[in-house]
């Protein structure tokens, strides 16, 4: 069985991500320090909360340098995806810079609520193993006030008063702005695709 490390970055979605993995037949290893990453074939960085608090927790856990050196597939979920980028406007905090780009606050408008909460359509941009067998027109469940504008690493977008990156993949570094653990069959498919993707 593939060893999956699930990082405890203090997010409230940790339990639901773990349960989603268990439904796929995977019992993840909960990780709170660098030693927990040893031997992992896949790493998942979930997150709910603020970027400054999450980065401080990763630093206190001694996980920043190990994440920067990581060679196996890594996926960030919701705030976890945002932490993969260079910088977040939320608290004006430097992030992991594993992917190029900056996290911006969503702009509210009369018909656009922030935070963005609920189901929204995924708009594929290019081929990716993460999107294998995900049907056209599939939707996912979002809860966020910050997002990454479209980048060259984006493989799917979402429109909420403007387009933003919904799924990102650059080599083995991946991210989902939505909550796959709350996105029914679409979310389960994307998690399975991540677990099965080529590690090269």
UniProtKB/Swiss-Prot annotation:
Keywords: Amino-acid biosynthesis, Cytoplasm, Glutamine amidotransferase, Histidine biosynthesis, Hydrolase, Lyase. The active site is at residues 78, 179, 181. GO terms for cellular component: cytoplasm. PROSITE patterns: GATASE_TYPE_1. Pathway: Amino-acid biosynthesis; L-histidine biosynthesis; L-histidine from 5-phospho-alpha-D-ribose 1-diphosphate: step 5/9. IGPS catalyzes the conversion of PRFAR and glutamine to IGP, AICAR and glutamate. The HisH subunit catalyzes the hydrolysis of glutamine to glutamate and ammonia as part of the synthesis of IGP and AICAR. The resulting ammonia molecule is channeled to the active site of HisF. This is Imidazole glycerol phosphate synthase subunit HisH.
